[in-house]
Curated annotation (Swiss-Prot):
InterPro entries, alphabetized: Ankyrin_rpt, Ankyrin_rpt-contain_sf
PANTHER family: ANKYRIN REPEAT PROTEIN, GH09064P
Signal peptide: none
Coiled-coil features, chain-numbered ranges: none
UniProt keyword list: ANK repeat, Repeat
Pfam family, one: Ank_2
Protein name, per record: Putative ankyrin repeat protein R880
Amino acid sequence: MNILPYEIHLLVIDYLYNDDLSIYFVNKYFFSMLKHSKIQNTIIKKIIKKGELGVIRYINKLFRVNDELVIGNKLFESSGINNYLLTACKYGHCKLVKYFVECGADIHYKTDYALQLACKYGYLEIVKYLVKKGANINTDDCYAVQLASREGHLKIVKYLVELGTNVRKDRDLAFRWSVENNHLSVTKYLVELGSDVRSEKNYAIKKSCEYGYFEMTQYLMNQGANFRVDNDYAVRFASKKWTFKYCRIFDIMWR
């Protein structure tokens, strides 16, 4: 430490009391100062969230040589390589995903949850990699495509369809979720594939009216959705809201 300027001493001290890990990743010397850190919990997942592949490799190296920095240090307590894979998928770090798989992580852990996370958060590159490695796109009644539809990731939806997934599982759940979250491009694509706009007692148009999705409501009506079901539920909901957005919906119902 004496070789560092006084200003750096102060900077290091400030960071030692901060939950930001960035300074520790500057080089091996700064990394070694983690033993003086005030951080209370394991930092492995935080490192993965930041996408620090080099740091993860270095930590593994320290474990292999039984380095005192990591052995018995609660900062480096492991929650398991499979959970690390899930974290990497959630935050979209494809290089880390590949690294954990190469190190033995199970891509089928928790019924292909890694693939489902990648679909949910929209990481097509990771989705393709996991599929290439054998991930099952149809687990949990094709939940992967349902998640992608719910979050509006059209490219992933199309990719899974190309691989043969069934978008109509659970009574057109993928379609209904796409409507509920106002992803019109996904909705149109699923309808083109045969999704029923009247499924579950016209659930889609009722939700579209409830949330004030004008373009979605107009599209569903043009496709034959019935806004008069359940004692005019959609009409009554739109009329109660009486804002400009809902007035537009109310207007198209009676054209």
